[in-house]
Amino acid sequence: MAKDIREKIKLESTAGTGHFYTTTKNKRNMPEKMLIKKFDPVARKHVDYKETKLK
């Protein structure tokens, strides 16, 4: 079988609330770490989410 191109990642809130989203990304098109602004329901506002490795 071919190796999967899409990698599972965890987007963790920079607000320090512990909230995170899980998603996938294409390793070939985006080799750098992602930084996305998304809604944090614990902080109840939009904050930056940084990519971390999914265990």
UniProtKB/Swiss-Prot annotation:
InterPro entries: Ribosomal_bL33 (IPR001705), Ribosomal_bL33_sf (IPR038584), Ribosomal_zn-bd (IPR011332). One of its GO terms (cellular component) is cytosolic large ribosomal subunit. Pfam families: Ribosomal_L33. Keywords: Ribonucleoprotein, Ribosomal protein. GO terms for biological process: translation. Transmembrane segments: none annotated. It comes from the Bacteria. PANTHER family: 54S RIBOSOMAL PROTEIN L39, MITOCHONDRIAL (PTHR15238), LARGE RIBOSOMAL SUBUNIT PROTEIN BL33M (PTHR15238:SF1). Belongs to the bacterial ribosomal protein bL33 family. NCBIfam families: PRK00595.1, rpmG_bact. HAMAP family: Ribosomal_bL33. This is Large ribosomal subunit protein bL33. It comes from Bordetella pertussis (strain Tohama I / ATCC BAA-589 / NCTC 13251).
